[in-house]
Amino acid sequence: MLDNPMMKRCIGMGALGLALLSAVAVAADPASESGVYTGHDLVVHAQARTPDQTTAFYLGRGFPAAMLKEFNQSCFVTVSMRHTRPDVVWLEPARWRLRDANGRIIERRDRHYWNRVWKAINAPHASRATFGWTQLPESRDLQPDEPVGGNITIVPPTGPFSLEFRFATGKNKTGPEIVGRIEGLVCQAQESDMVTGNAP
């Protein structure tokens, strides 16, 4: 069981996690900010989360230890976007590519992956549902000025990596494709002390 000092730490980290994982980031000068793409009337923010941030967020929502341990085997990347184009922009993370510093593809762990994990460990259905709404939708037609945000999860790379995204446009996906890239993302590979029990 978690001791009192750890729980105090979790409460503070949980509040931080909520702000980090659910808010759409706003920057005065997004073109010069790390982890931001701007172009084609589109702004995309991406940030890899630390294990403590991820663990605190879900621990604060009552997730069991078995689920938290699974999160330590993945890197969570929070992505948010908004566009001001006159047409529809299609959010489809399956079309995105993540690459390590050597150009190798990094595996994205989609909802099918997590559903298999939750079934294997008999995760509570309420926690499964909560986890689901914190992930980016697998497909959504974004209307002008409609914000969206959530996480994608990947196999943790050992160094910097890039996110290349592709967006179809237009009601029937017949408009010009938008392609962009965010580089210099980094995942922390160590386990969260909140799960291992080493928190001060």
Predicted features, each with a name:
Residues 13-23:
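Bacterial N-terminal signal peptides
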Residues 2-15:
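Bacterial N-terminal signal peptides that target proteins for export
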Residues 1-2, 108:
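Intrinsically disordered, low-complexity peptide-like regions
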Residues 27-200:
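Conserved functional micro-motifs across diverse proteins
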